[in-house]
Amino acid sequence: MAHKKAAGSTRNGRDSNPKMLGVKVFGGQDVVAGNIIVRQRGTEFHAGAGVGMGRDHTLFALTDGVVKFDTKGKFNRRYVSVQEA
């Protein structure tokens, strides 16, 4: 027979797993085709020349080369490109 009163419930006790987002390869570093450059939610960075975008907005290298980050356009969007080495 239990000699402890029933405890109240709580609305806490949950936490989501880390998503490991962010820049994986920085400007000036070498990449080969298929390397992930940026993992992101939404288009914080846009795909430039030599860079593709996955359906979860992940940017990846389409060609071998060197990563370059720059801002362009009226809205100062940040672009990631891969230049041939």
Swiss-Prot record:
Keywords: Ribonucleoprotein, Ribosomal protein. Residues 1-20 are annotated as: Disordered. It holds the Pfam family Ribosomal_L27. The keyword Ribosomal protein applies. GO terms for molecular function: structural constituent of ribosome. The keyword Ribonucleoprotein applies. It comes from the Bacteria. GO terms for cellular component: cytosolic large ribosomal subunit. GO terms for biological process: translation. NCBIfam families: L27. Belongs to the bacterial ribosomal protein bL27 family. This is Large ribosomal subunit protein bL27. The lineage of its organism: Bacteria, Pseudomonadati, Pseudomonadota, Gammaproteobacteria, Moraxellales. The gene is rpmA.
